[in-house]
Amino acid sequence: MSRAGFDKYITVFSPEGSLYQVEYAFKAVTYAGLLTVAIRCKDAVLVFTQHSVPDKLMRPETITSLYNVNDNTGVCITGRAPDGKALVQKARNEASEYKYRYGMPMLVSVLAKPWQDMAQVRTQQAGMRLMGTIMTFVGMEQNDEDGAWIPQIYCVDPAGGAAVHACAVGKKQIEACAFLEKKQKNAPFHTLSQKEAAMIALAALQSALGESLRASGVEVGRCTADDHHFLRVSDREVKKWLTPLAKPGYRAAYVLVRHTFHVVNP
């Protein structure tokens, strides 16, 4: 059925029950050509994203998708960079005002949930353009009952969002999600060590993209139970995680997964 007349306004449903403007916003995320994978483990939360320099004249160290919102919360933007940077600045302002008012850092759940609600409300307002980006918030939160630090991941997309154990967003996200779902069935992510979780996330990236990764081509951010601050992982440590994945046994495993699911590129 033709989309004529049903994709002019964000508030109009198509006969199939779709909001085409929301679908277009998700496509804008994939057109950026980057894939992001975030994963929780036993004592940490990690986010991995491709690092690509769009112009050879740009300085590579100035191009990033990872940002600190406050000391304890990080965010990865996937999609249209200008939209993402504007949202990051708003999130930083909210976190700063919260700390000034209450004297304590804003928790990742307190920050992300209102943003998810706001994204959903924007789908009901014809006068506002949806953001062509997905924000992946990561951080550690302390359990009120036993004081244990629990890793958290919240995705904020053009339709709303959710709290997740792991996620993949952007280019070829369907393949990466299929890989993560298979691994989750074999070994729940909350039982894994940091190294095991990191290797699964990197293998998901390689499986979806169909190519080997280099440490310089991946940005990694992390929060741990020992250090609650959101920090970047060095290329040296990323290289240690990538080395076992270059072995024939690992390559055969993720190629097998890729062909088993028969997924279609978004």
UniProtKB/Swiss-Prot annotation:
One Gene Ontology BP term is: ubiquitin-dependent protein catabolic process
* Stored CDD domains: proteasome_alpha_type_6
| Location within or outside the cell | Cytoplasm; Nucleus
Show the SMART domains listed in the entry.
Answer: Proteasome_A_N
> What start and end residues bound the annotated signal peptide?
none
May I have one GO cellular component term? cytoplasm
Which InterPro entries did the record assign? Answer: Ntn_hydrolases_N, Proteasome_alpha, Proteasome_alpha-type, Proteasome_asu_N, Proteasome_sua/b, Proteasome_subunit_alpha6
**What domain of life does the UniProt record list for this protein's source?**
Eukaryota
Q: Recite the UniProt keywords alphabetically.
A: Cytoplasm, Nucleus, Proteasome
**Pfam families according to UniProt:** Proteasome, Proteasome_A_N
Record text on subunit structure and interactions = The 26S proteasome consists of a 20S proteasome core and two 19S regulatory subunits. The 20S proteasome core is composed of 28 subunits that are arranged in four stacked rings, resulting in a barrel-shaped structure. The two end rings are each formed by seven alpha subunits, and the two central rings are each formed by seven beta subunits. The catalytic chamber with the active sites is on the inside of the barrel.
Role of this protein: The proteasome is a multicatalytic proteinase complex which is characterized by its ability to cleave peptides with Arg, Phe, Tyr, Leu, and Glu adjacent to the leaving group at neutral or slightly basic pH. The proteasome has an ATP-dependent proteolytic activity.
Which family does this protein fall into?
Answer: Belongs to the peptidase T1A family.
Output this protein's name.
Proteasome subunit alpha type-1
